[in-house]
């Protein structure tokens, strides 16, 4: 029997839904103002050419051409001294009456007139603001970008010279208007869609690198310069400053930065502990790494300088490995590359994977991603194993780009030590859905010793890996190198030499070797778990769960609704089975344990039929999971579960199994329940873990205690 879903909507919610339908959906369409040629300080022929270029429509969204991106020039290490805050040296505004449409030519005014105009416009704040850095700081930090702000639409145009780099914290919506820029390995060119970029202190800061214009263009430098200037003018209601326009040439990159406001950012910022999530970390604050720029600050971006502005630190082996993997995809092989990335904790695997995915997306439409790391997942909440098809760049940490994978299994824990066999069998079931038409990236756990290393050996064999990327740090490797020679004689958890045939190989085919690539991580703090705020592993897991729960919020701007304000689905006990994945719980106590907990919403192949009570699973199944939910309450009298989940009803109707795991709700969801008077639900301090039986009993399946291992002697 499939899940029966009943959900009742209040009248106020219906009125809000009807009202939202009356508003337009396209948020980014803007009216473009046409310029009069008499306003330009150029010849009539040049003005006419600029008008023709400005009248051209903005190119439609397109995929990036299959061209290799230009190399990125890295910032040099500069000393980050304690300096005073840098203030803009010039603030220039166009002389326009705010209540009319008259514009005056600056060239005919006297010096006194221009000074009075600048003073008047600085008081009026006439919808425009230009920000540049003083020449001394530009020379010191290499940041010679120029930005211009349109207050009326809260967006900024950033002009960058070729090879210039902007390292920043914050979040914004980025659109490339002219030229090419690169962010975390992904090349963005003019005409492509806007991309959200997130640079919180949970990870290294992002950088925007100007790659210049396309060299294959048939336009000469003058035509390219006029085209770039015309594009800049299209995004302002009044004439931009001369200082900004003088910086625009045919080799410039013009980027539009807009404030980013999404249900995710609104939901996270509603918690007092997360108000500085997109600000600076303690080290950046202490070293005064922030550059004062009111234009960038207005759109949610803080530029960095000095050693804090290095961004992603790539060693020579890092760059060579990325180049080698791109060549493997571009070359003609009998099958797509299958790339397994491994390494110890805090060695940089996740960042390397994102960089590799973005680099591959410059040359292919999609990349398949097999998630084997239960604790630090990329696209799902923690505790999930998944297979995703990635088609969009990853321009932020994992909690900023969660998505619904095509195939997912709910394991229910942040590690697999308690049941390694179920872990491997779950991955095998996911691997059977790999298409084989796109490059595959396999992300692994940071558990590389003991049984964790045996699991790595199994994964290399079972999935017929073509490339193994092993990240290490320091002078000595953290584990044995996973070369082809070593794999032939190594013992895994399930596989042993001679090599067991891989899932994709014929049993009579000879064993294949793989390409081994070693990457030396040279960034500061490699191998050391994050100790600053928002960098601890449990905090990152909480952010991933909060990001998933934020899908419940409305896409329209408005107040944030607490979890207890959502009307739950009513699910009959007889239509779904329930089980516990991570420990042994007496059947009579399972519903007590599941109340107010996170559950996996799964689909069993067989029907579930109950007789007058809850259906309890005796074993944990390996089955498709469509998402997570919060079991808000249990009504034993009516035989109902009350479930809150962002999963759509069309998908939810196929769910017939609820799996309770070790993944729990973030504390702040329970401690900050707005709108509740008196005692907070599910919160108590009157509890003692010293009472016998108060804690949970961990069961490690398949692992024998050392004292009970029989000796061969």
UniProtKB/Swiss-Prot annotation:
Superkingdom classification of source: Eukaryota
A GO CC term assigned to this protein in UniProt: nucleolus
InterPro entries named among the record's database cross-references: Clp1/Grc3 (IPR045116), CLP1_P (IPR032319), P-loop_NTPase (IPR027417)
One protein family per Pfam: CLP1_P
Compositional bias annotation for Basic residues: 1-32
Biological processes annotated in GO: cleavage in ITS2 between 5.8S rRNA and LSU-rRNA of tricistronic rRNA transcript (SSU-rRNA, 5.8S rRNA, LSU-rRNA); definitive hemopoiesis; digestive tract development; exocrine pancreas development; liver development; pancreas morphogenesis; rRNA processing
Predominant subcellular localization, coarse grouping: nucleus
Region (Disordered): 1-39
Residues engaged in binding ATP: 343-350
Localization annotation: Nucleus; Nucleus, Nucleolus
GO-annotated molecular function: ATP binding; polynucleotide 5'-hydroxyl-kinase activity; RNA binding
EC number: 2.7.1.78
Annotated keywords: ATP-binding, Kinase, Nucleotide-binding, Nucleus, Phosphoprotein, RNA-binding, rRNA processing, Transferase
Catalytic activity as recorded in UniProt: a 5'-end dephospho-2'-deoxyribonucleoside-DNA + ATP = a 5'-end 5'-phospho-2'-deoxyribonucleoside-DNA + ADP + H(+); a 5'-end dephospho-ribonucleoside-RNA + ATP = a 5'-end 5'-phospho-ribonucleoside-RNA + ADP + H(+)
Disruption phenotype: Morpholino knockdown results in hypoplasia of the pancreas, liver, and intestine and defective hematopoiesis. Defective pre-rRNA processing within ITS2, resulting in the accumulation of ITS2 containing rRNA precursors.
Chain segments annotated as coiled-coil in the UniProt record: none
Family: Belongs to the Clp1 family. NOL9/GRC3 subfamily.
Family matches, as PANTHER family: CLEAVAGE/POLYADENYLATION FACTOR IA SUBUNIT CLP1P, POLYNUCLEOTIDE 5'-HYDROXYL-KINASE NOL9
Primary role: Polynucleotide kinase that can phosphorylate the 5'-hydroxyl groups of single-stranded and double-stranded RNA and DNA substrates. Required for the efficient pre-rRNA processing of internal transcribed spacer 2 (ITS2). Essential for definitive hematopoiesis and pancreas morphogenesis.
Identification of the protein by name: Polynucleotide 5'-hydroxyl-kinase NOL9
Lineage: Eukaryota, Metazoa, Chordata, Craniata, Vertebrata
Gene designation: nol9
């Amino acid at each position: 029997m499939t899940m029966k879903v009943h959900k009742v909507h209040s009248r106020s919610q219906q009125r809000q839904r009807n009202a939202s339908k009356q508003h337009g959906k396209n948020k980014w369409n803007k009216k473009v103002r046409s310029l009069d040629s008499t306003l330009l300080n150029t010849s009539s022929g040049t003005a006419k050419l600029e008008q023709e270029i400005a009248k051209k429509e903005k190119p439609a969204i397109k995929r990036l051409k299959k061209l290799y991106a230009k190399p990125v020039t890295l910032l040099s290490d500069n000393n980050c001294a304690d300096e005073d805050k840098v203030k803009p040296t010039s603030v220039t505004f166009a002389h326009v009456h705010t209540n009319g449409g008259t514009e005056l030519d600056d060239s005919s005014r006297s010096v006194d007139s221009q000074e009075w105009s600048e003073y008047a416009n600085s008081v009026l704040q006439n919808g425009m603001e230009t920000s540049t850095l003083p020449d001394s700081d530009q020379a010191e930090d290499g940041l010679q970008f120029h930005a211009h702000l349109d207050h009326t639409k809260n967006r900024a145009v950033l002009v960058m010279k070729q090879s210039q780099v902007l390292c920043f914290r914050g979040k914004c919506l980025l659109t490339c208007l002219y030229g090419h820029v690169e962010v975390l390995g992904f090349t963005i060119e003019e005409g492509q869609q806007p991309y959200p970029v997130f640079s919180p202190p949970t990870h290294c800061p992002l950088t925007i690198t100007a790659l210049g214009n396309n060299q294959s263009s048939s336009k000469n430098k003058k035509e390219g310069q006029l085209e770039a200037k015309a594009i800049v003018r299209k995004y302002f209601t009044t004439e931009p400053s001369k200082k900004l326009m003088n910086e625009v040439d045919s080799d410039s990159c013009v980027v539009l930065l807009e404030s980013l406001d999404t249900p995710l950012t609104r939901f996270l910022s509603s918690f007092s502990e997360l108000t500085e999530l997109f600000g600076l970390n303690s080290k950046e604050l202490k070293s005064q790494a922030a550059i004062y720029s009111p234009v960038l600050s207005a759109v949610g971006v803080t530029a960095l300088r000095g050693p804090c502005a290095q961004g992603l630190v790539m060693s020579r082996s890092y760059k060579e490995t990325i180049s080698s993997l791109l060549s493997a995809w571009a070359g003609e092989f009998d099958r797509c590359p299958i790339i397994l990335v491994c390494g110890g904790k805090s060695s940089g695997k996740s960042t390397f994977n994102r960089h590799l995915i973005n680099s591959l997306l410059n040359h292919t439409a999609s990349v398949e991603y097999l998630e084997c790391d239960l604790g630090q997942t990329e696209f799902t909440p923690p505790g999930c194993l998944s297979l995703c098809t990635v088609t969009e760049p990853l321009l932020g940490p994992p909690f900023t780009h969660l998505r619904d994978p095509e195939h997912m299994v709910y394991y229910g824990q942040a590690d697999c030590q308690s049941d390694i066999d179920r872990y491997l069998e779950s991955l095998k079931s996911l691997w059977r859905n790999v298409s084989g038409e796109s490059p595959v990236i396999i992300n692994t756990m940071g558990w590389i010793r003991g049984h964790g290393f045996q699991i790595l050996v199994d994964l290399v064999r079972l999935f017929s890996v073509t490339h193994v990327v092993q990240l290490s740090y320091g002078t000595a490797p953290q584990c044995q190198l996973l070369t082809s020679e070593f794999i032939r004689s190594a013992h895994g958890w399930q596989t042993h030499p001679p090599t067991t045939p891989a899932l994709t190989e014929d049993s009579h085919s000879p064993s294949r070797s793989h390409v081994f690539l070693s990457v030396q991580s040279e960034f500061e703090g490699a191998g050391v778990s994050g100790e600053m705020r928002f960098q601890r592993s449990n905090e990152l897991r909480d952010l991933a769960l909060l990001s998933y729960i934020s899908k419940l919020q409305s896409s329209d701007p408005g107040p944030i609704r607490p979890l207890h304000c959502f009307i739950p689905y009513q699910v009959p006990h007889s239509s779904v089975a329930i089980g516990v994945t991570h420990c042994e719980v007496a059947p009579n106590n399972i519903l007590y344990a599941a109340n107010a907990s996170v559950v996996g919403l799964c689909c069993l192949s067989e029907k579930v039929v109950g007789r007058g009570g809850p259906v309890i699973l005796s074993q944990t199944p390996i089955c498709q999971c469509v998402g997570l939910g919060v079991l808000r309450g249990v009504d034993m009298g009516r035989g109902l579960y009350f479930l809150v989940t962002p999963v759509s009803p069309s998908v939810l109707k196929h769910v017939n199994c609820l799996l309770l795991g070790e993944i729990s709700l973030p504390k702040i969801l329970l401690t900050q329940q707005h709108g509740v008077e008196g005692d907070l639900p599910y919160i108590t301090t009157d509890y003692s873990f010293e009472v016998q039986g108060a804690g949970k009993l961990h069961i490690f399946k398949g692992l024998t205690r050392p004292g009970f291992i029989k000796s061969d002697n």
